[in-house]
């Protein structure tokens, strides 16, 4: 046999580290994120395909150890053995190793066996190092795991290969193991030995283990969070970059009369009402289930557990498509304090998450609590906007959005930390969730596409108060209404008034600086540009140089879409590789014709590119070929070999 070469993973949509994708295997295609029900090869009685399983996982070691199952698997194949015609992943016996301390098979033997029975995705025999062990023991076992992963490549023939990330609760070892595995020619990466963390609700440590691993894994390879089968965890895990989950929980919990839900777990004997609207919950009452024989009751509860689990996977995929995954995460994490603690821990990894966060999304940003202030969108905005504020700031309380349309033309009643006089002042609205909003940017995503409760919580007040104090270190005056709202007392009164009208040219220049970097505004928009407004909305729509279109201001997010003249100006005025995606010779003629750019043809790009950025498509000599919208971030563009990377808007340069 030869390696099945059509394996493919393609990213279809993104929200932070979360992504939906297509995983193509020899026995079919899987939509990710995906849940893999665990199938017991000898006693499976539950239908998993009906509720939604596109891929399953079974234990090759159990098959190997049972003479009857082994003979049937070798003669008929694992698909016929477990009666599932879709993709099958097999485990190598690592679970038994972690439970019993020893197993009766060597790594080469179990790798060959998985290949011989026709599994789609096999797994090397890693060492599942438990949480809390010494650094010395953990590194020794990581080295064994790495050696076995390398060895597995030699023995596998046709199947795809899992290489498991280990490292216990030592983030440095997780990163080390992941970085070494990333160098190997394997296809997927489980993140292992995390079940004890989940069982004991140690979600903060789980976040460290997962994100330390993901930080070093290639974006082109799906990541499998091993043993994560409870639906209350799916949203958080996907937001950390996990694509696959396996669930034995659906049947194990059913054995104990426990029903899964996204809010937690219900014991059947405590229920007065059934918890969801699946067929089991609508057809039976708790008392009716309690009156059944044990096997029938177990099967029905398992069916419910599968339905609620697959429903949550579908909801997570839709949330990624809509761009509101983090709102779902914040909702789910309020099901348990330890889960919320884990989510809060993610704020320690904002620089990692920011690399994968799209620049613009189709959904608004909702402030649902103080955790929202730790989201990457807020982190990114504050980092960028402070570069563009300049000096002499007038900080004002929020009004109805867009602020620039609802504020009075002139505002009086300001105070300051030091005596101030004269003008002009740059007007900055101070408001949740983004804190600092210059009027020139009040129609730009995500500042305009956000909402927060009118009654602030204490964390929100302190967040805004801290920003105001930081800005008062320079020349700043503060609206008395804002001082009152935030409980700030300032010694000096400013007796003048502040002009709030925003000049159109100032607006488009600042948007360009915010979007493309400092200096882009004057580069794109000289003093003689012509600005057109929409007849319907009155908002800026097009910016021209004579009759040549420089940019369109997109109505949905207030960001700039490059026209032909804008692309030429940005290309001439910036050095390679700024805002560029370079394609090879094979792709060049297609890009010139306006065809989309696929990841496998990209030879270089600007490391600062994020999904939904406007980009310049060039060849190896930096000749401008076309413009387009990035669908992937820079790291994904350079790593993936499948799928669209840039949706080309205009070619023919």
Curated annotation (Swiss-Prot):
The keyword RNA-binding does not apply. Substrate binds at residues 126, 193. GO terms for molecular function: pentosyltransferase activity; RNA binding; zinc ion binding. Zn(2+) binds at residues 276, 278, 281. Binds 1 zinc ion per subunit. Its EC number is 2.4.2.48. NCBIfam families: arcsn_tRNA_tgt, tgt_general, unchar_dom_2. Belongs to the archaeosine tRNA-ribosyltransferase family. This is tRNA-guanine(15) transglycosylase. It comes from Methanothermobacter thermautotrophicus (strain ATCC 29096 / DSM 1053 / JCM 10044 / NBRC 100330 / Delta H) (Methanobacterium thermoautotrophicum). The gene is tgtA.
């Amino acid at each position: 046999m030869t390696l099945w070469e059509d394996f493919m993973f393609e990213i279809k949509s993104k929200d932070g580290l979360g992504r939906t994708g297509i995983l193509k295997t020899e026995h079919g295609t899987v939509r990710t994120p995906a849940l893999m029900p665990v199938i017991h090869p000898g006693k499976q009685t539950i239908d998993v395909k009906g509720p939604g399983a596109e891929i399953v996982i079974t234990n090759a070691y159990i098959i190997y150890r049972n003479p009857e199952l082994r003979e049937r698997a070798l003669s008929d194949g694992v698909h016929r053995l477990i009666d599932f015609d879709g993709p099958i992943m097999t485990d190598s016996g690592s679970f038994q190793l972690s439970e019993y301390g020893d197993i009766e098979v060597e790594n080469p033997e179990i790798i060959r066996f998985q290949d011989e029975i026709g599994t789609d995705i096999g797994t090397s025999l890693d060492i599942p190092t438990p949480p809390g062990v010494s650094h010395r023991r953990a590194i020794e076992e990581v080295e064994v795991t790495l050696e076995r992963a390398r060895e597995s490549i030699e023995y596998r023939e046709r199947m795809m290969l899992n290489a498991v990330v280990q490292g216990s609760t030592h983030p440095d070892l997780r990163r080390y193991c992941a970085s070494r595995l990333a160098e190997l020619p394997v296809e997927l990466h489980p993140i292992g030995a995390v079940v004890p963390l989940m069982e004991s609700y140690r979600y903060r440590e789980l976040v460290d283990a997962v994100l330390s691993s993901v930080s070093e894994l290639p974006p082109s390879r799906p990541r499998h969070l091993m043993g994560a089968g409870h639906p209350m965890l799916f949203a958080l895990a996907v937001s950390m970059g996990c694509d696959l989950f396996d669930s034995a929980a659906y049947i194990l919990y059913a054995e104990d009369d426990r029903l899964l839900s996204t809010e937690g777990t219900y014991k059947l004997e405590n229920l007065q009402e059934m918890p969801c609207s699946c067929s089991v919950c609508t057809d039976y009452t708790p008392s009716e289930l309690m009156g059944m024989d044990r096997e029938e009751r177990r099967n029905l509860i398992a069916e419910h557990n599968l339905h609620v689990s697959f429903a949550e996977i579908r909801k997570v995929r839709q949330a990624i498509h809509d761009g509101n995954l983090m709102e779902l995460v914040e909702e789910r994490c309020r099901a348990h304090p330890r889960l919320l603690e884990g989510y809060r821990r993610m704020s320690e990894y904002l620089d990692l998450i920011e690399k994968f966060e799209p620049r613009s999304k189709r959904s608004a940003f909702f402030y649902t609590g103080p955790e929202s202030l730790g989201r990457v969108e807020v982190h990114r905005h504050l980092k960028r906007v402070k570069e563009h504020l300049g000096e002499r700031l007038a900080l004002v309380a929020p009004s109805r959005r867009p602020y620039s349309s609802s504020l009075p033309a002139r505002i009086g009643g300001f105070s300051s930390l030091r005596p101030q006089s004269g003008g002009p002042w740059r007007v900055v609205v101070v408001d949740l969730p983004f804190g600092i909003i210059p009027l020139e940017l009040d129609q730009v995503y995500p500042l305009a596409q956000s909402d927060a409760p009118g009654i602030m919580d204490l964390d929100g007040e302190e967040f805004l108060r801290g920003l105001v104090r930081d800005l008062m270190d320079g020349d700043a005056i503060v609206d008395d209404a804002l001082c009152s709202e935030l409980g700030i007392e300032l010694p000096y009164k400013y007796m003048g008034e502040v002009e709030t009208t925003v000049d159109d040219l100032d607006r488009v220049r600042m948007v360009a600086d915010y979007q493309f970097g400092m200096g882009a505004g004057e580069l794109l928009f000289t003093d003689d540009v012509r600005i057109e407004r929409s007849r319907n909305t009155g908002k800026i729509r097009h910016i021209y140089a004579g009759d040549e279109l420089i940019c369109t201001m997109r109505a949905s997010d207030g960001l700039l879409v490059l026209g032909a003249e804008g692309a030429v100006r940005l290309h001439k005025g910036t050095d390679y590789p700024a805002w560029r995606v370079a394609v090879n010779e094979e792709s060049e003629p297609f890009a010139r014709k306006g065809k989309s750019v696929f990841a496998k043809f990209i030879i270089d790009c600007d490391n600062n590119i994020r999904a939904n950025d406007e980009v310049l498509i060039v060849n190896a000599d930096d000749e401008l070929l076309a413009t387009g919208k990035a669908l992937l971030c820079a790291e994904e563009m350079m790593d993936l070999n499948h799928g669209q990377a840039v949706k080309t808007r205009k070619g023919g340069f």
